[in-house]
Amino acid sequence: MKSVITTVVGAADSASRFPSASDMESVQGSIQRAAARLEAAEKLSANYDAIAQRAVDAVYAQYPNGATGRQPRQCATEGKEKCKRDFVHYLRLINYCLVTGGTGPLDELAINGQKEVYKALSIDAGTYVAGFSNMRNDGCSPRDMSAQALTAYNTLLDYVINSLG
């Protein structure tokens, strides 16, 4: 999985050079933000099930059939379970990104090819956007986590939302 550190080192190595001053500044910034990212990862690990369930509830409140594609889900219970499973999967990848300090886990294990998969399954990505937007708007500092941790978490949610758009 890629992180800022592995990306910087890999780029320098590919160019047969030592990391530059700007490379080192990038790594230093990542290290300085690490405490906030790890706080967000810890809070997410402890609350992922409730976060995913609130997202599912928001999706089904906005889209009663659970999908806005061509084929509404046949069984609301099964659809909700699958929707929650998908949100939990994304939250786990977001957690990995918070730990590594990069978007590699999301890029490699979720974002690449997601639009094609959703289209093939007749699932409108808008349902996921609604759920991720709910997650983003539901987070509160200092109730849930510090402002810096919430920013790190929300940045990754925005990354996912934008990839679906």
Curated annotation (Swiss-Prot):
It comes from the Bacteria. Heterodimer of an alpha and a beta chain. Coiled coil: none annotated. The keyword Electron transport applies. It is a peripheral membrane protein. Phycourobilin binds at residue 75. The keyword Thylakoid applies. InterPro entries: Globin-like_sf, Phycobilisome_asu/bsu, Phycobilisome_asu/bsu_sf. It comes from Synechococcus sp. (strain WH8020). Light-harvesting photosynthetic bile pigment-protein from the phycobiliprotein complex. This is C-phycoerythrin class 2 subunit alpha. One of its GO terms (biological process) is photosynthesis. Keywords: Antenna complex, Bile pigment, Chromophore, Electron transport, Membrane, Photosynthesis, Phycobilisome, Thylakoid, Transport. It is found in: Cellular thylakoid membrane. (2R,3E)-phycoerythrobilin 2 binds at residue 140.
